[in-house]
Amino acid sequence: MGAYKYMQELWRKKQSDVMRFLLRVRCWQYRQLSALHRAPRATRPDKARRLGYKAKQGYVIYRVRVRRGGRKRPVPKGATYGKPVHHGVNQLKFARSLQSIAEERAGRHCGGLRVLNSYWVGEDSTYKFFEVILIDTFHKAIRRNPDMQWITKAVHKHREMRGLTSAGKKSRGLGKGHKFHLTIGGSRRAAWRRRNTLQLHRYR
């Protein structure tokens, strides 16, 4: 086994004494830093490389802190209108994951970069910490690399805002296999529309 395989096995056993101590110390360190800051290098190089990261020019890593818990509806003084069934304020859950929120914040902060992917690096009772891989699409090392030229195209601008990253696709219900029949055709809406449209084919 290579070195990265050993690192992967270490990260799989998060309850081991070594990892518990490491994660505790790292969470303390991340809490002292700002909510969004550039990381000098990948905390999990094995995971980052599996997600497409390379330690070369044009690749950047940002660490993002996201507050855990549900989402409170932003209503002034709790004033909600309409039927009582829609009056909920507190016990609401956001449709997307905290990881996709971290990607969105990093992408908004670094508007000139493209979000490639992200991964978990730690959490405590209040926060979750993610590292987001961003790519500078104007760097010659990226533009001249045939494997990464796809992300330089304009269609991939702010892909994290449109649910095109791995974390964003999960909340959209996209995937392969019998668990993802609700999104056959590209989305939940497309699948619903096809199943609820009556087609009367002409008899010939």
Swiss-Prot record:
Coiled coil listed as a keyword: no
GO cellular component annotations of the record: cytosolic large ribosomal subunit
Key words, A-Z: Cytoplasm, Ribonucleoprotein, Ribosomal protein
MF-aspect GO terms: RNA binding; structural constituent of ribosome
Superkingdom of the organism of origin: Eukaryota
InterPro entries named among the record's database cross-references: Rbsml_eL15_core_dom_sf, Ribosomal_eL15, Ribosomal_eL15_CS, Ribosomal_uL23/eL15/eS24_sf
Annotated compartments: Cytoplasm
Keyword match Cytoplasm: yes
Entries under Pfam families matching the protein: Ribosomal_L15e (PF00827)
One BP term from GO: cytoplasmic translation
Similarity field: Belongs to the eukaryotic ribosomal protein eL15 family.
PANTHER family from the UniProt entry: LARGE RIBOSOMAL SUBUNIT PROTEIN EL15 (PTHR11847:SF4), RIBOSOMAL PROTEIN L15 (PTHR11847)
UniProt function note: Component of the large ribosomal subunit. The ribosome is a large ribonucleoprotein complex responsible for the synthesis of proteins in the cell.
Subunit note: Component of the large ribosomal subunit.
Protein's UniProt name: Large ribosomal subunit protein eL15
Lineage: Eukaryota, Metazoa, Chordata, Craniata, Vertebrata
Protein's gene: rpl15
